[in-house]
Amino acid sequence: VSDQVRHILAMNNVDEILFGNAFATEEEFKQVADVMKEVYVHVDKVTQFGEMISNILPHGDLKRLPLGIELAEGVTDTEKEILHYGSHQVSEYIHYMIRSRWTRLFYKNADIPCRDCGKEYFEKGDVLIVNNNLSFYKAEIQICMKPMKNTGQRNLLGHISKDALCILDLIHKGDIFTITE
């Protein structure tokens, strides 16, 4: 049910969700409520980077798409903190990845050593963080859209569930999302 609600929200053209054909269980209503708690949030304006940056950072009352992740083994506490940074904004949507660059501004001094995940190629739905080996982009969160060679510049944080992969195709530049476990 939670992936279905995320999919409906990603379509960005639904005002109301009705359940029919059978009674929803308490667990299903709880799943819907948990997703909806992540959707509408208020984010204060960040001023530490100057007026120009503070005006383009997402702030105010926001609607964001919560994406569920199956966390990979070995993710560090620093990587988890960056991953769960409140609201990611799609800065670029290129054919092979979704990029959320604001975390690299807030976490530019973080230490993110390279971790081997044992994969030669990342696949659609893999959630990545740029590590110390690509310092200019370090701490940027990326979501793979197509197979991409693992060059040692990104660490695997986890994977969007198979049932929710279709949601990624509905995300566009400027959309705001958050990562949940």
Residue ranges and their predicted role:
Residues 53-181:
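C-terminal functional modules
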